[in-house]
Regions:
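Non-catalytic, polymerase-adjacent accessory regions of viral genome-replication enzymes
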Residues: 1-209
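Core nucleotidyl-transferase/polymerase catalytic module
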Residues: 1-53, 64, 79, 197-462
Length: 462
């Protein structure tokens, strides 16, 4: 009886999490006093508005200056202190978060066929195939069991919706239960892959908006980064695939700049380069995450999922114990289908991510890469790989095979001198993929010291 009551209460929590109650219009009047509050502009063209919920608080950061750093600078370098004294890492308020969300409010390319130029499509397809080869794992890892994936979550971090204000450590059993319930949504569609799974009708928990600041010298114009705080139940489902995938890439030395100190990695990578023949390129895409088109996200998900076995160790042991060969084969096919259905669900959520803003309003994006997913880094990396190869194919660039390295929106590659042009690359990306190349941050250079990769500058080639 006690277990039934607990299950009923847990079910009500899940229902409450996905059926958000309407509330009164938030009070947007500017408060009296000296502080000026900028009212957010909530009108969007492509981002879909959802039913509003309730307000919640967002941590905005600590003081503008660290007291110990301030004391040390005043004592030993007063001129430097006076130069940076007006700076801050504090993010902005709700209006700044809406400005960040607005970056996702743009036209999308849903499939490759929507690009009219056949030659451009062929170059994009070649770039995707190159990425598929580069990210292919010879030894594919097995996916995790549900309990193993829950154990991958960081217990001292926020649990997200619906456990607002709680750490994951306090609600681990509930997270596992909700993840299992979402996982069970796909099971009725695993027998026959011809049957369409209505994933858009599934009631899935929402992301919450968090914020992260960037250093700026003018505290009246703070730099703000919108953080998509994924619900723990979705993270637990993602971890079944993403966690073993990252570990496999570190071990098998694939094109991700992972597993070693970035400074050592890049120096070793550049050690055998003939500087008289090969130049270095590093591209920087403005608003990288928000400008990614959904057809590239789908291709990146396909590549990622194809590099993880559809079975956990636990599932394989279960199949091996089945009585007849026919039973084992049937369950084998069912598990493969479930792997594909889980990909459909997580891919849909990744592209069409719902987010609740601190003022209670909620929205659903239709393109771009959300920052809080387990898949964010690998999806960004695959797409970045495609961007660079695409620009090289469009120019007929001669590039060094197996030398392109990426991590998220950072990249470094070798090209033959005189065969690559940044202006042409910017034009091709803007015209055909609707993304903007930052000339200020992109580099075409002869020496490693002229590049900045993963935040490192290599003075004197080191």
């Amino acid at each position: 009886m006690h277990q039934n009551q607990f299950a009923a209460r847990l079910h009500r929590k899940v229902v409450e999490a996905v059926q958000l109650p309407p509330v009164h219009e938030p009070d947007l009047a500017e408060p009296t006093g000296t502080t000026e509050v900028k009212i957010p502009n909530r009108s969007f063209t492509h981002v879909k508005s959802l039913k509003p919920s309730f307000k919640y608080g967002v941590r905005r950061g600590g003081p503008d200056q660290d007291q110990y750093v301030r004391f040390a600078l005043k004592q030993y370098n007063l001129s430097l202190y006076e130069e940076i004294a007006g700076g801050t890492r504090k993010p902005g308020g709700d209006a700044a978060l809406y400005d960040e969300l607005r970056n996702f409010d743009g036209p999308d390319i849903k499939k490759l066929e929507d690009i009219p130029n056949q030659e451009v499509r062929s170059h994009i397809l070649r770039a995707i195939r190159d990425a598929e080869k580069a990210f292919h794992l010879e030894q594919k890892p097995k996916r995790l069991s549900m309990q193993e994936s829950v154990d991958e979550l960081k217990p001292n971090t926020a649990a997200g919706w619906p456990w607002i204000g709680k750490k994951k450590a306090l609600v681990m059993p509930e997270i596992a239960q909700m993840a299992e319930e979402i996982h069970n949504l796909v099971k009725p569609y695993c027998t026959d892959m011809e049957v369409r799974m209505p994933v858009e009708e599934f009631r899935l928990p929402w992301c919450m908006a968090a914020t992260r600041g960037g250093m700026t010298k003018d505290k009246t114009r703070p730099k703000t980064r919108l953080v998509w705080m994924f619900p723990s139940a979705i993270l637990a489902l993602e971890a079944r695939i993403a966690s073993p995938l990252y570990k496999a890439y570190v071990k098998q030395c694939k094109p991700l700049l992972l597993g070693r100190s970035p400074s050592v990695y890049v120096q070793d990578w550049d050690a055998d380069r003939d500087t008289t023949q090969w130049e270095l390129i590093g591209l920087d895409i403005s608003h990288f995450d928000s400008e990614v088109k959904s057809f590239l996200v789908k291709e990146a998900f396909r590549i990622a999922f194809n590099n993880v076995h559809a079975f956990s160790t636990e599932t394989l042991e279960k199949i091996q114990k089945m009585g007849t060969v026919e039973e084992r084969n049937d369950h084998f096919r069912w598990e493969v289908n479930k792997h594909k259905r889980i990909r459909q669900l997580l891919q849909y959520y990744f592209i069409n991510t719902p987010i609740m803003m601190p003022d209670g309003y909620a929205f659903r994006k239709k393109r771009g890469v959300p920052s809080g997913s387990f898949f964010t880094q690998v999806i960004d990396s695959i797409i970045n790989y495609v961007y660079i190869r695409f620009t090289e194919y469009m120019q007929g660039t001669i590039f060094a095979h197996d030398k392109l390295r990426v991590l998220g929106d950072d990249s470094i590659d070798r090209v033959l001198r005189g065969t690559y042009d940044l202006e042409k690359a910017a034009s091709d990306l803007e015209q055909h993929l609707k993304v903007t190349l930052s000339f200020k941050k992109s580099i075409l250079a002869s020496e490693l010291k002229d590049l900045k990769v993963l935040g490192f500058e290599y003075e004197g080639g080191r």
